[in-house]
């Protein structure tokens, strides 16, 4: 079994030397949401690199209202992954949660199971078509 961490800007300042010393073997970082980069993404990538903590994956928190927006989020995510210098072996996760549904409802869009599946497929198919996992 491996010991990893999942972090986003909500964790604030991270002492990556202390994290590495604690036995953390990999990281999964929030890359962003909508068309916005997580405020700590690049800092966390650099902190992981400086302390030999492999970034095994990133996740994009979705606020898509349709499949086209989900694909656009995938394209945005890939652009940030490339900008960070992460390789094609980086696993890209699609994060569709309650807040995704809540925000959509506030905009008059009801998201159910069918939309969740369609958006997830659109995002993941885009990611895999660009050589990522």
Residue ranges and their predicted role:
Residues 1-25, 29-124, 128-130:
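Substrate-binding cleft of extracellular glycoside hydrolase catalytic domains
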């Amino acid at each position: 079994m491996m010991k990893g961490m999942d972090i986003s800007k909500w964790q604030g300042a991270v002492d990556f030397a202390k994290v590495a010393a604690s036995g953390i073997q990999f990281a999964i970082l929030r890359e962003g949401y909508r068309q916005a980069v997580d405020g700590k993404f690049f800092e966390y990538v650099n902190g992981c690199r400086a302390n030999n903590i492999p970034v095994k994956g990133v996740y994009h928190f979705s606020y898509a209202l349709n499949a086209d927006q989900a694909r656009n989020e995938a394209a945005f995510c890939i652009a940030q992954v490339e900008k960070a210098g992460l390789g094609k072996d980086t696993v890209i996760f699609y994060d569709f949660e309650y807040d995704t549904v809540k925000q959509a409802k506030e905009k008059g869009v009801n998201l159910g199971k069918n939309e969740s599946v369609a958006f997830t497929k659109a995002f993941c198919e885009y990611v895999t078509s660009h050589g990522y996992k």
